């Protein structure tokens, strides 16, 4: 009997101190991601958000273990932010009000011939390392630069990081860290006669004066093509035949904020309200679930080393084909 009570002690002790466990997790999370706060009040409010997010992650993963979801979540560097804050500070898609489709820029796929069942341009050397846009609405610049990098590799055989900051500072028809649009960026590169390399024009994550240097020009563009809205078959053809494609999605959900692995599909993801620009770098199938390989610009500590597998052929999930385009080089 005494032995039984003794064995229970550690269990009871642990059960009575969940706050200590949370304290330890919070301190470790802050240290891991270099978090510092201006005041104790600020830290308390941020911790409450973090705890709420942690609970959502735990509940989701329990449901996933029971087969309710095809993807898992994990805590990351965005843990002390609400999903509303993430959209406000870390997206940045801003479509021009006067934008309209033109037959001159519409992509018409060549439907003859098969395309691969899967393709991953990371393995083909078309994709530069994942970047972090920080709290600047420059997703459009990273998406555009990534698509240009893919075409540069295809044309020259060389992979070179191009400058999102060049686009942030110099595309006058966009709004820098206040947001922008990918085809506007492609038009700028075409009319400007080029875009600088990342090394020549490094990213600083804020609006600066345009410092484009023609002698540091690393790539040109001779126009762009837009994928027909809602047509995932056309997007697949474009990815297979052309290369990485700039797209927009709804990134407003907590499930996207903390995506970790698996094929992301959330029925609440709003295909009619896209707000974030990313890059499709391939497609495939996992355990019977078709997906797009998406390169994000929230750093390697987000998602699966900076990437998400987004559900493919699931009724335009998250609006992935609403604003898809690629540059011509």
UniProtKB/Swiss-Prot annotation:
Entry function: Thiol protease involved in osteoclastic bone resorption and may participate partially in the disorder of bone remodeling. Displays potent endoprotease activity against fibrinogen at acid pH. May play an important role in extracellular matrix degradation. Involved in the release of thyroid hormone thyroxine (T4) by limited proteolysis of TG/thyroglobulin in the thyroid follicle lumen.
Keyword Lipid biosynthesis attached: no
Natural source organism: Rattus norvegicus
Propiece residue ranges: 16-114
Descriptive protein name: Cathepsin K
Family classification: Belongs to the peptidase C1 family.
Gene that encodes it: Ctsk
Pfam families: Inhibitor_I29 (PF08246), Peptidase_C1 (PF00112)
Disulfide bonds: 136-177, 170-210, 269-318
Gene Ontology molecular function: collagen binding; cysteine-type endopeptidase activity; cysteine-type peptidase activity; fibronectin binding; proteoglycan binding
């Amino acid at each position: 009997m005494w032995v039984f009570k003794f064995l229970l002690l550690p269990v009871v002790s642990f059960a009575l101190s969940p706050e200590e466990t949370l304290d330890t997790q919070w301190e470790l999370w802050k240290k891991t991601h270099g978090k510092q706060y201006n005041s104790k009040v600020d830290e308390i409010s941020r911790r409450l958000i973090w705890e709420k997010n942690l609970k959502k992650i735990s509940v989701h993963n329990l449901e996933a273990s029971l087969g309710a979801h095809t993807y898992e979540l994990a805590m990351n560097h965005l843990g002390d932010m609400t999903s509303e804050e993430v959209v406000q500070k870390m997206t940045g898609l801003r479509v021009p009000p006067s934008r309209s489709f033109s037959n001159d820029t519409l992509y018409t796929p060549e439907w003859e011939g098969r395309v691969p069942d899967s393709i991953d341009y990371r393995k083909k050397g078309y994709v530069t390392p994942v970047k972090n846009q920080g709290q600047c609405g420059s997703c459009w610049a990273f998406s555009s630069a990534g698509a240009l990098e893919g075409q540069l590799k295809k044309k020259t055989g060389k992979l070179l990081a191009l400058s999102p900051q060049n686009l942030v500072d110099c595309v006058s028809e966009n709004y820098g860290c206040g947001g922008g649009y990918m085809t506007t960026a492609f038009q700028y590169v075409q009319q400007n006669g080029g875009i600088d390399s990342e090394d020549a024009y490094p990213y600083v994550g804020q609006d600066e004066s345009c410092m484009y240097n023609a002698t540091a020009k690393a790539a040109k563009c001779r126009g762009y093509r837009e994928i027909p809205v809602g047509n995932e078959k056309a997007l697949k053809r474009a990815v297979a035949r052309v290369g990485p494609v700039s797209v927009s999605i709804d990134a407003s959900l907590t499930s996207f904020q903390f995506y970790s692995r698996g094929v992301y599909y959330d029925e609440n993801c709003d295909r009619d309200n896209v707000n974030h620009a990313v890059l499709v770098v391939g497609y495939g199938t996992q355990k019977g679930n078709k997906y797009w390989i998406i390169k994000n610009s929230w750093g390697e500590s987000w998602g699966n080393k900076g990437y998400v597998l987004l559900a493919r052929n699931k009724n335009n999930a998250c609006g992935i084909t609403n604003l898809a385009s690629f540059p011509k080089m």
